[in-house]
Every structure is written in C-alpha cells, then in structure tokens.
C-alpha cells in the first residue's frame, strides 16, 4: 500500500512470549507451512509481499537477510509473492517514456526460480505516482495516451508472468464516491474502463483486479467497489477479482460474519476475491492482551476467506515486522505481521493456522468442489 522507509525500533518481547508460547499458542506447524495448509483448505495460495531489493536499504538489519530470505523463498510458508513497491508508477516510469523494471524484475525472477505465483501491483494508482503525471495539466486525449502507454509497457514487460494484476488501486473515498485523483478529474470513471480494457489486451491471461482498503466489511465503500465491478461487466470489459487489502487494527477488528458478508457481496457478482495486503497493526509496545486480539483478528479474516468459495488466496504485506510500512504512517502502532524482529512467530501465526486447519477438517467433497470452481 505504501512505501516503507528505514528500520523502526520496536520494544522486543521475551522470546518465549513473542513466539506465542503463552496461553493459546496451539500446535507449531512450522514444519508444514502456511501455503501448504492453505492449499489443503482449498485456497490457491498463501503468500507474502516483499520489497527485495528494497529491504537491503534498511541499515542495521544486514545480519537478518539470510533468515529472511530462507523463510521468504526456501520455506513452505509462502506460495506466492507481490512486489511491494517495484512495479508502481513512481519506480517503473519516473520520467515519461523512461522505464526501469529493476526492482520488480528481482521479485519476478525469484518467484519464477522458486516456483511461486506472482501477484503484480499496481498499474494505476493516485499515490506513489510519478510527479510528471500528477503535476501536468492534461487534456483527456493526452491522459488517455499516458495511461495506455504505461499499461502497455509495464504489463507487456511482465506478460505471462503475473497470475493477477491490481489494475486500478484505491479509486474510492470512504463514502463510496470516486477519489479526486488526476485520472478521475480529467477522465471521470472512464479511466477505470480504459485501464482494465488495456490490461486485458496486453496480458489476456492475467487475472485483473480492482484493489482497495476498508472493503473487509459491508459499507458504503464496499458498495462503491461493487459499482466498479458492475461498471466493467456492463461494458463487457474483463474484471476477474476484487482485492481486499485488509490493513486492519487489532483493537477494533471486524467480526467473522462481517468479513464473510463483504466477501460474498463480491463473489455474488461473479468475481473472485483475495486478501491482498493483509496486516493487522496494534498499539506498541505489544502486550499479551493486544497480541491475543491480533490473533483473533487474523483468524477471523483468514477464516472468512477459507469459508467463502470465491476467496482464492491470502497475501500478507511482508511477513517480518521490521520491514512493515505501518510504524511510519501510524505513530505508536506496529508489529502488524506474523514474525517478530527475532524471527519468532506472533501468536497470530497460530490463529492463521487454526483458520486454515479448521477448513481441512471439512468434508473432502466440499474441498473438491471448491478446487473444481477454482480451476473453472
């Protein structure tokens, strides 16, 4: 969602407490892996975003890189990845017609090397946008060409590599109206249709997603996202999925029923759903109480994805707390992921395990039916 900067200093919990060895830890499935459990539950993947090589810029963490890379690329925890920043407009086209795919290519290459799905992110977004786009007074004709040229170059460069593209990111206000981005001010909702239409032409095999935050419970904003799905479907323009970013708060998280209702609201429109940027921040320093709330929140949102057939996968927005964007945008909050600074696991890790393994205890028929629908 946002560009993470340098290392934040988080008070470190005692190892046993941080690893979730207190009350309610549950069985350690570290030898199994979240992606393995997710696939047994009928999901397509459980993944983590990464800012490789951006992570290398975090001074003082050099000794952490080998273990980070082992978990990210060489363990059974993750079956997919997303470049956190490397495919965004600011980085790939900083000047008009001048493209730099270096960071995105590193992640794409590693995903290919280690047999992981690649979710690509994000073609058109108002934030982390190159200044030349935002600061120019465009005519409609000129801005259409800018959008088409950008998507053609970027999606074309990664053609055949991306399981899915977040084509348009965060186009909505909280009340469900359109955000007044440079794209909307000049073109109105036409820019959304143009972006999806162009992406479909350039990479016809990629799943095309609308992606946004605060879509994880029924609200005016979820209704706005449904309007976007209907807009594209009515125009016969491909849209295959809606991404629920799921940047949540441990102390005030939605219920399981809220999540299920929101996900079903989209799948009933004939699109798949994925949790695309999952993290659940809490007030720091972490306590036993808010870590328990975080565990419950992770269990609810992952459990909802497992329980609704059209929800195909989960991506956490990195997995290692020191690499999270959260502390730089929310003062006094952090520890939003599943691994602490010492690489011990949050109690929330075991909440995710519980959400995934509860599904595996259901009938083989329900899992087979789900897999058949995913392959359809």
UniProtKB/Swiss-Prot annotation:
Induction (record text): Expression is inhibited by the transcription factor CreA in the presence of glucose.
Keyword Oxidoreductase listed: no
Glycosylation site residues: 100, 358
Record-annotated GH10 domain positions: 55-355
GO BP of this protein: xylan catabolic process
Biotechnology annotation for this entry: Considering the detergent and textile solutions that are neutral to alkaline and must be tolerant to high temperatures and SDS, the three xylanases XynA, XynB and XynC having such favorable properties might represent potential candidates in the detergent and textile industries. Together with their wide substrate specificities, the XynA, XynB and XynC thermophilic xylanases could also be of considerable commercial interest in various other industries, especially in the brewing industry.
Short name of one Pfam family: Glyco_hydro_10
Activity regulation as described: Partial inhibition of activity is detected in the presence of Ag(+), Cu2(+) and SDS. Like most fungal xylanases, activity is completely inhibited by Hg(2+) since Hg(2+) could interact with tryptophan residues and oxidize the indole ring. Beta-mercaptoethanol enhances the enzymatic activity by counteracting the oxidation effects of the S-S linkage between cysteine residues.
Reactions the enzyme catalyzes: Endohydrolysis of (1->4)-beta-D-xylosidic linkages in xylans
Family stated for the protein in its record: Belongs to the glycosyl hydrolase 10 (cellulase F) family.
Protein name: Endo-1,4-beta-xylanase A
Species of the source: Humicola insolens
């Amino acid at each position: 969602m946002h560009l993470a900067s340098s290392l934040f200093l988080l008070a470190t919990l005692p190892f046993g407490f941080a690893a979730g060895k207190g009350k309610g830890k549950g069985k350690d499935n570290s030898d199994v892996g979240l992606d393995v459990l997710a696939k047994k539950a009928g999901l397509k993947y459980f993944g983590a975003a990464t800012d490789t090589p951006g992570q290398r810029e975090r001074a003082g963490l050099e000794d952490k890189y080998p273990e980070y890379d082992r978990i990210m690329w060489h363990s059974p925890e993750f079956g997919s990845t997303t470049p956190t920043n490397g495919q965004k407009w600011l980085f790939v086209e900083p000047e008009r017609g001048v493209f730099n795919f270096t960071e995105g290519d590193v992640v794409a290459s590693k995903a290919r090397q280690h047999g992981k799905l690649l979710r690509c992110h994000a073609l058109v977004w108002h934030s982390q946008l190159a200044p030349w786009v935002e600061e120019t007074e465009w005519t409609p004709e000129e801005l259409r060409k800018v959008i088409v040229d950008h998507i053609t170059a970027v999606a074309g460069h990664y053609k055949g590599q991306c399981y899915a593209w977040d084509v348009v990111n965060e186009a909505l206000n909280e009340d469900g109206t359109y955000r007044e981005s440079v794209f909307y001010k000049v073109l109105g909702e036409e820019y959304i249709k143009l972006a999806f239409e162009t992406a479909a032409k350039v990479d016809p095999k990629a799943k095309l997603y609308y992606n946004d935050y605060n879509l994880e419970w029924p609200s005016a904003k979820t209704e706005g996202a449904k309007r976007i799905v209907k807009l594209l479907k009515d125009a016969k323009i491909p849209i295959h999925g809606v991404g629920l970013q799921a940047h949540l708060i441990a102390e005030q998280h939605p219920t399981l029923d809220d999540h299920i209702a929101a996900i079903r609201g989209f799948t009933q429109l004939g699109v798949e759903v994925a949790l695309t940027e999952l993290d659940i921040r809490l007030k720091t320093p972490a306590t036993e109480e808010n870590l328990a709330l975080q565990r419950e929140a992770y269990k609810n949102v992952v459990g909802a994805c497992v329980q609704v057939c059209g929800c195909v996968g989960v991506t956490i927005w990195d997995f290692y707390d020191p690499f999270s964007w959260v502390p730089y945008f929310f003062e006094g909050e952090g520890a939003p992921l599943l691994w602490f600074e010492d690489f011990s696991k949050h109690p929330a890790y075991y909440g995710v395990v519980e959400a995934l393994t509860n599904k595996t205890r259901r009938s083989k028929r329900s899992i087979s039916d789900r897999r058949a629908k995913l392959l359809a």
